Amino acid sequence: DNYILSGKKTFVIDGASSDLIIVLARTSGSRGDSTGLTLFIVNADQDGINKIKLDMADSRNYANITFDNVTVSSDSILGDLETAGETIDDILDIGRIAISAEMLGNAEAAFNTTLDYLKQRKQFGVLIGSFQALQHRAAEMFCEIELTKSSVMAAMRAADERSNDLQRLSSLAKTVSGETLHLVSNEAIQMHGGIGVTDEYDIG
């Protein structure tokens, strides 16, 4: 049996550079119904697929992808027919944990870079790391990072144990990690001063 894929998806991560695309498509049922969903694995250069690379601030090779009557065979089905609803829920949970860990890592890298800068930069002959106000701000950054680690680790543990709390904990980890990264990266830039928005340091 063959299937016809039509539709579009915006902001596909690595969509501009991928050779294969995993597509979630409705093969039965109606919109809003969690059943009747099937995963297909499709060659990115197949006729009817159009990829438009987006210029973004990061390096994830985002793309908008359009499917115009793309023919795929039943051999392209990933998993079983019309069982993708449950699979997608699991994938989204794991995806939240993965992006949480990435944001946590970025926050920790920004913090460590800032600590090094505080120990090296002098103002009026005095290391700025000796200023109590900056010490307080660095301590807050450290506390938020350590608390975020606990949240991410709890979500990872729930994934390993296939816990019923996985969705809740993965969502929590993503929320907390995002807030922590925002706080730490902003503080890191502020503590670096004007040089914090240049390419001379990774903070910029």
Where are these predicted regions, by residue range?
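Flexible, small-/acidic-enriched active-site or ligand-binding loops
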Residues: 43-77
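Alpha-helical interface subdomain recognition
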Residues: 2-4, 81, 87-204
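A generic structural signal for well-ordered coil/turn residues at beta-strand boundaries
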Residues: 17-19, 35-36, 45, 60-66, ...
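Residue-level signal for inorganic ion chemistry
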Residues: 7, 40, 65-67, 107, ...
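A short core secondary-structure module
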Residues: 2, 6-50
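Solvent-exposed alpha-helices and their adjacent loops that cap or buttress functional pockets
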Residues: 13-17, 29-34, 55-60, 80, ...
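Short, ordered beta-strand-loop transition motifs
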Residues: 1-4, 57-59
